[in-house]
C-alpha cells in the first residue's frame, strides 16, 4: 500500500513539474512574441540628477539600466521627465533631461533608437533595439506657454501628466485639492488649461491624469 502511495505521489509530482515547465515555456513564448512597453520609468531623472550613465551597469544603484532592460525583454521604454514644483526654470531643466536621453541614444546606436511615431517604433522593434520615448510628469514644466508645449512635443514628448503633486496656474493636483493649501482658490482647469488640453489633442499627445485632482479630472473629460 505504501509503495502504491509513493508511486502515486511521485506521478503527481512529476505531472506538476511538467505542468510548471510548460507554463514557464508558454510565458516565455508569449513574452518573446509581444511588444513589451513600459510607459513610465524614472531612470532618466535619477541618472540626470546623480550623474549616472544608463548604459553602464547600475546594479545596486538603480532598479534598471540599458542591459537589464534588454535582458528583461523591454521593447519600448517611455522615459519620464520630472522635476518638483520648486525647481527653478523647469522648462530648461526638462530639456537638459531630454538632452541626456539623446546622448544615451547617440552613444548606443546598435542598442537604442529614439522614436516619435509608430513606424519608427516598429522599425526599432524589428531591429531589436530599445525604442526610447518620453513622457513628462508635471505641466509646470511648460511654464504656462503653449509654444513650450509644442517644442517639447517636437523633441519627442508624447504624453504629459497635467500636474504632479503640486498644482500649476492652470490645473490643480489631487494633493492640493484634498488639503487646505488651495484655500479659496478655484479647483480644476482654468480657461488656459482647457486651451492646453485642446492643443494636446491637436498634437495627438496623451493627456495623463495621474496626480490630478478630482475636479481637474472631470474638467478634462
Can you say where each PLM-predicted feature lies in the sequence?
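Alpha-helical transmembrane segments and their juxtamembrane interfaces
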Residues: 17-18, 50, 218
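Basic side chains
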Residues: 7-8, 158, 199
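A generic signature of intrinsically disordered, low-complexity regions enriched in glycine/proline
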Residues: 6-10, 42, 46, 212
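N-terminal hydrophobic targeting/anchoring segments and the immediately downstream early-domain regions
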Residues: 25-183, 221
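Histidine/acidic residue-rich metal-binding segments in metalloenzymes
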Residues: 144-154, 176-221
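Bacterial Sec-dependent N-terminal signal peptides
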Residues: 1-29
Amino acid at each position: 500500500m505504501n509503495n502504491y502511495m509513493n508511486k502515486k505521489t511521485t506521478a503527481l509530482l512529476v505531472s506538476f513539474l511538467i505542468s510548471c515547465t510548460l507554463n514557464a515555456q508558454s510565458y516565455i513564448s508569449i513574452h518573446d512574441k509581444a511588444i513589451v512597453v513600459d510607459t513610465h520609468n524614472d531612470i532618466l531623472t535619477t541618472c540626470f540628477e546623480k550623474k549616472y550613465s544608463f548604459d553602464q551597469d547600475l546594479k545596486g544603484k538603480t532598479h534598471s539600466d540599458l542591459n537589464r532592460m534588454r535582458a528583461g525583454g523591454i521593447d519600448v521604454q517611455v522615459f519620464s521627465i520630472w522635476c518638483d514644483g520648486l525647481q527653478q526654470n523647469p522648462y530648461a531643466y526638462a530639456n537638459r533631461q531630454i538632452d541626456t536621453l539623446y546622448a544615451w541614444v547617440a552613444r548606443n546606436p546598435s542598442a537604442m533608437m529614439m522614436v516619435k511615431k509608430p513606424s519608427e517604433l516598429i522599425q526599432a522593434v524589428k531591429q531589436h533595439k530599445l525604442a526610447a520615448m518620453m513622457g513628462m510628469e508635471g505641466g509646470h514644466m511648460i511654464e504656462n506657454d503653449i509654444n513650450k508645449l509644442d517644442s517639447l512635443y517636437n523633441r519627442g514628448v508624447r504624453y504629459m501628466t497635467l500636474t504632479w503633486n503640486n498644482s500649476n496656474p492652470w490645473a490643480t493636483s489631487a494633493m492640493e485639492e484634498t488639503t487646505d493649501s488651495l484655500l479659496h482658490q478655484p479647483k480644476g482647469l482654468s480657461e488656459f488649461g482647457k486651451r492646453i488640453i485642446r492643443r494636446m489633442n491637436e498634437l495627438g499627445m496623451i493627456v495623463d491624469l495621474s496626480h490630478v485632482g478630482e475636479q481637474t479630472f472631470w474638467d478634462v473629460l
